[in-house]
Amino acid sequence: MSDQITIGVLALQGDYDAHRQTLSLLGVRSVLVRKPEELDDIDGLVIPGGESSTFLKFLDREGFLAKLRDFVSQKPAFGTCAGAILLAKEVRNPTQESLGILDIAIQRNAYGRQIDSSIMTGPTKLDGPPLEMVFIRAPRIERTGAGVEVLAEREQHPVLVRQGKILAATFHPELSSDTRVHELFVNMVREQEKPRVQVTR
């Protein structure tokens, strides 16, 4: 039975295909989002990793930023690595513009450059075993607001957080065989869509 949801994956940079593959494994319809108007046709949005300052240049150039701000204020969004930076309320090292929707302070490239990237497992509040986490030039969450739930940690720093309909990971769950983080986001989108589905019956 179809869940009647469509999740968009922002396809301006980063490994957006890996996110689509994971969503496909979960039986969820996904589309690549490259134009602002394509946000109108989706129920949730994945913002993949990459370089956050480059992301901003693309968004400014394409007229995306205002439309994206409006989207994340109303519908579920999931940011990984650079995507988490874009969602954050405060960005450090250096400071930069962001969507400001997620009440965290995040430091860019906190764990070193790409050569220092790592794969590890860590404790998580998600059901099941410890979570495999792939870090690539990862940012570090240095502060979380009162409404932010920490779902996984690395060295006592949050690496997976949720605030309402917003989910963010400083690692790359799309590069792991563990699909639980994407499953969580899919369920968040389904929950958001329930009232709309019920009204149209």
Where are the predicted features?
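Redox-cofactor binding/interface segments in oxidoreductases and associated redox assembly factors
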Residues: 47, 79, 169
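Hydrophobic anchor at the start of a short beta-strand
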Residues: 30-31, 77, 166
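Amide-donor transfer/coupling interface in amidating biosynthetic enzymes
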Residues: 108-201
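Cofactor-binding loop segments of dinucleotide-utilizing enzymes, especially the Rossmann-like FAD-
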Residues: 12, 82, 171
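N-terminal beta1-alpha1 cap of cysteine-dependent amidohydrolase-like domains
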Residues: 1-61, 67-70, 179-183, 187-201
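Cysteine-nucleophile active-site neighborhood
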Residues: 52-123
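Short coil/turn connectors at secondary-structure junctions
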Residues: 4, 42, 73-75, 96-97, ...
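Solvent-exposed alpha-helices and their adjacent loops that cap or buttress functional pockets
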Residues: 1-3, 37-40, 70, 78, ...
